[in-house]
Amino acid sequence: MSKATTANTIYSPGYRNYALAILFLGYVVNFIDRSILSILLEPIKQELLLSDTELGLLGGLAFAMFYATLGIPIASLADRWSRTKVLAISMIIWSAMTALCGAANNFLMLLLARIGVGVGEAGASPPSHSLISDYFPVEKRATALSIYALGIPFGSMIGNFVGGWGAAELGWRMTFLLVGLPGIFVAGIILTTLREPPRGMSESAAVKAAAAKNVEPAPALKEVFKFLWQRKSFRHLGFAAGLHAFVGYGAGVWNAPFLIRSHEMPITEVGSWLAIISGIGAIGTFGGGYLGDKLSDWTDDRRWYLWIAGISTLVMVPFQFTAYLYDGIWTVIPALAVVSILGGMYLGPSFAMTQALVTLRMRAVASALLLFMLNIIGMGLGPYFVGIASDLLNPSFEIHSLRYALCLCVLANLWAAVHYFLGAITLREDLDSTEVLMTQHS
């Protein structure tokens, strides 16, 4: 299999790194606005008198349904129009809707505002992944995508810290306003400084030559769906990422209420600890993509991308059970830190292989399709499942019902690991068929 040559000379390495830094900053803002709700769930529950099921709906399904479904048509637009403009407009929308969450006086108003956040954030990652794939060649792409994905732990870290402090000092309403406004400023930076790279400019010479001859528009959505579904490795990868996210989002939304209820932590302390834990998770988020690039390069075997995702997912499980079943806080906090490191290792490899499995004009849609599976199964159902399970277990376990609901959620990681290993079986064959198609098409 041929590798990409050195990256293009259209943009300097310094500018490409600058572009990655700006996209990373946008993703940090994305996850601040997305994750802030978790730390604010308890004060919202107390003021608006909501059940755990309703909180799970706010933290998951209401956001994810619109985030995931609109991500696909928005990604299709990004494959046809300016990706930087799609990203900036989306950022303005989700930032404004985050600020409006603070004006909600009842469950319905807050639900609608969270839906608005989901609508805006649907336009974040698909164009960003596509841009990164054109700025960086294939042998550096997983590392670049992992750096972008560092927006998750760093955004969550800031969201938890600001949320814990803001809930105690400002109240949950003003906290939403505080975190919503910076995204509008970042959107302005994207519009004025981020350039739209030529599609395919960081591919191998053969692929670039074919791309230069091929000026046809991007394929229809159904063609992209069919193309990806025919690749067994992507089917397994998509299900694995979705199940992994089911646990990740289910736990992520409910970790703060768990620490408050089962360990009687004050909200400012919870915010500080979860901020530290989220920041530590950056090690795994970067490390997963970096290890994938290095091991696949050393062994000339790109199955390592999915093997890394599968191994890290499997190893997480005992640490998750330790975090939720042990009573000593000095056991719980280190266990959650290990989970945070391992939990991000699937991101870079998963998105890098998704980009590698499709042709140039399918990249934003391919990213959106993986995000659809990840977010419908993960973000949509994970927090909602934990909320429902907690309410159902409450008559038997009372304040500790959330702890056992989280343990039930963790079991999905065992299933996710199986799909990663199954996906690795056909990965080389699927990658080869895509590369042949790109080099021969004209």
Q: Can you describe what each PLM-predicted range is?
A:
Residues L49, S82, A103-M109, P137, ...:
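Helix-breaking motifs and short loop linkers at transmembrane-helix boundaries and internal kinks
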Residues Y148-R199:
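Helix-loop-helix hairpin linking two adjacent transmembrane segments in secondary transporters
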Residues L37-S38, R231-F286, G343-L347, F351, ...:
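Extracytoplasmic gate region of multi-pass secondary transporters
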